[in-house]
Amino acid sequence: MWIIAFRRQDSLNRIFYTQGDYGLFQCSEPCHKETYDNEEIIKKMVLSQGFQIKDGELQKPEDGEIKLTVPFSLIPYCPRCGKPMSMNLRSDQTFVEDEGWHQAAERYEKFIQEHKKQKIVFLELGVGYNTPGIIKYPFWQMTNTFQHAFYVCLNQGEAYAPEEIRKKSVCMNEEVRKSVGRERV
């Protein structure tokens, strides 16, 4: 789940992954507050299962046989303590907010403060109630507080806006994958 603040000059430093980033590993313990890019190891894992990557697109094996395991040698371990690595996702108290996360949080807060009197859309895609205080409730509060704010929620089975902001909201009870982009492998 992402909070994304877009402007015309989009770039990666304008994205704040407040709930984490599937593209990063962290120590599962965690023994330290650092994350690691996992793109190369994930590609190796995917290829080891028989998939192919052509023109940046993931393709099923030609024979249709997908291996459901990866070689032991591809399992990542923490370079400091040796424990298994895990995805950098906010699921419990082990979530690592590294330096990059804190820098992104500051950029996000600055963006909100600089634009709160302008037209702003809070777009919520597939956010549930696992940790509503991180994305959902702040979006509702800012929509209610900021005069020109608008809230858009796309979430199958959980598309909802409180009464206080319903006139400034659009809620769509649809699956994000089918509504926003084409389905992938």
What are these regions (language model features)?
Residues 1-185:
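Conserved catalytic alpha/beta core of Sir2/sirtuin-type deacylases, generalized to analogous enzyme cores
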